[in-house]
């Protein structure tokens, strides 16, 4: 199966909706250039689809050209439950950096946080 295809266990007609609970890893960390930024968010699955390892965090702005843009969830969060999602990537540049993200289901449909699926999600850190 490719990285972004329909998952066989995805309930037909289910709704993707994710609520933000907390930044487990706070923004504003100082990181040396070339080191890895590791960010963890706590989400609540407010939809009817299980959020599985076939979901992704998708970087939509702020990364270097050619950088990895898809990051697997690496966990499953059932509807009505909370769970942590962690991503990691190398940092470049200097000063305050921000990378914006959306979520993506196994079909490749991207969406944001909240009831309207438009809520913003990002990492912000200082490269030294």
Labelled PLM ranges:
Residues 67-94, 106:
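Intrinsically disordered, low-complexity Pro/Gly/Ser/Thr-rich segments with frequent PxxP/GP/PP motifs
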Residues 17-23, 59-73:
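Short beta-strand and strand-turn-strand segments in soluble, beta-rich domains
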Residues 25-31, 74:
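Short beta-strand segments of immunoglobulin-like
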Residues 53-54, 93-128:
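Terminal connector regions
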Residues 40-46, 88:
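Short edge beta-strand/loop segments characteristic of extracellular beta-sandwich folds
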Residues 44-66, 103-105:
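Short acidic, flexible loop segments centered on an aromatic residue
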Residues 7-21:
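Proline/serine/threonine-rich low-complexity linkers at boundaries of modular beta-sandwich domains
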Residues 34-40, 96-99:
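Short, solvent-exposed loop/turn segments enriched in Ser/Thr/Gly
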């Amino acid at each position: 199966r490719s990285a972004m295809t329909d998952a066989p266990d995805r309930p037909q007609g289910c709704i993707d909706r994710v609520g933000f609970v907390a930044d487990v890893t706070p923004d504003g960390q100082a990181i040396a250039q070339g080191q890895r930024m590791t960010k963890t968010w706590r989400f609540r699955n407010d939809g009817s689809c299980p959020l599985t390892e076939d979901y992704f965090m998708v970087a939509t702005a702020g990364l270097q050209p050619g950088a990895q843009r898809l990051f697997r969830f690496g966990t499953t969060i059932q509807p009505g439950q909370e769970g942590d999602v962690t991503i990691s990537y190398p940092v470049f540049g200097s000063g305050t950096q921000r990378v914006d993200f959306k979520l993506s289901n196994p079909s490749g449909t991207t969406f944001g946080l909240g009831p309207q699926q438009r809520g913003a999600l990002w990492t912000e850190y200082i490269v030294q």
